[in-house]
From Swiss-Prot:
Name of the featured protein: Efflux pump terG
Transmembrane helix is among the record's keywords: yes
Cellular component GO terms, alphabetical: plasma membrane
Gene designation per UniProt: terG
Assigned protein family: Belongs to the major facilitator superfamily.
Amino acid sequence: MSSSTLEGQETASHHSKNSPSRHGDDGGLQTAGDEYVYIADHYGMVRRMIFIMTVCSSMFTNQLGLCNSLSTLEEIGESFGVTDPGKLSWTISGYGLTLGTFILIGGRLGDEFGNKAIFVIGMGWLALTSMMAGVSVYAGYPVYILARVLQGLGPALTVPNALAIMGKCFSEHPRNMGFAWFAASAPVGAMAGLLFGPLFTMAWWPWIYWSQALGVAFVFALSIVAIPNMPAESEQKQRRTILEILERIDLLGGACGVTALVLFNFAWNQSLVATWKEPYVYVCLILSFLFLAAFFYVELRVARHPILPVAVLTSDIAFVFGCTAAGWSTFGIWLFYVIRICLNIGGQTPIQMAAWLSPILVTGIGTALIVGKIITKVPASSIMLFAMLCYFITSLLMALRPVHSIYWTYFFFATIIATFAMDSSLPAATIIFANAVPRQYQGMGSSVIMTIVVYSISLGLGFAGTIELQINNGGHTKADLLHGYRGTLWFSVGLTAFGTVLALIFLLKDLRRRKLARTQVEEEKGHSSEA
């Protein structure tokens, strides 16, 4: 196998029909009669680096798209004549809405039609919608928000399939480090968005998205040749009827789930614009619960290939869902409202905010790589508690921070600690999920957790925005604005306190389970020695 060329149509060889699960959890098993060859294990250094960079670009572009508008909301809104904070927040929450809602479906489409194909389609879609977001300057704010919402579909297709590609192409040890680099690309993408967003705005804000479109178009072309076909893809292309395809991708369950998530999120975020006095807002909320009930019924009673294994969800998964949602929703609140405080009250500039947040670049990469090394040696429940404590400390520091305090006190330490929280909670949650479900469902762990992560960020902003509007007295003065911002940060403190308690309970439960397991092993050894 040549390691010096990038032949996209190169396919891994294998001796059976048993390929790894979606994220490679079972891919490391080899027997004499059933051997799976990991194609990327045989790559040379240059080819391997290009492959990893291409796959990790999905997380990079995901975070880039989320953060490139964070500190430029006011400038973008001003060009459209929009100053309402509720309408401006749709720039972020709209992107997160579609991303969080469609990740599971993106993973299922990759299972059915090929991970590489869906990855490439996702990159192409992201490039086109990024161009649309820039061109919307000539069309109006609704078109801009529509473009942002459609942008979220791109990472929803690329992120889960990037994880699948990594899992199928690498054996266990290089796979773990590949996942670590995947996580490390998140702070790099976030930092790029925070830095280049304001820089391009100094020229003209549409260049934020036009430059993104050009970069993603390059990755689109590179992914065609840099990513090999998965060995199972030829098998997935066998002829199936339309009904069989729809059944395998769980179209009915997916439609009910997506509708429920979209309506629930829309109700909370649109309430910032129209308030709860508008009938259509709370009608959407009621309908979301009805569709959610329909989703659970379909997954439990109807679907032969459920998109989410509702029947096997346990208390362990409930704990990890609660911790993940609490932590990452506060991350969205913290990032959005701390930037608003600094820009609108503290007088800092967007470029200055990029400099203040720059430590996430170093600590993010370092934490991700360290966690990649220790994740198999330290109980995931302990790592989750550590992450939730970091979330809590970060939220508390930012809620207590005086507006005009120097950078090296509250802000610097909160930024460092927040990075520890993010890069340790995600792998811990994925492992806990994988350990809590039957083996055939372990491969979807990353997709499920990413769904919780991204959807929580978007929904958390909706909750926080409701609190802000209720207590800021209209936001006519800086004091009123600050009061509303502070309220959202204290809300994040409460969320992280709740998540920390959940993580502590789960840790105690896990320690008790481990103790019982050790006792049982010792008793079995004693019985066997007596025999």
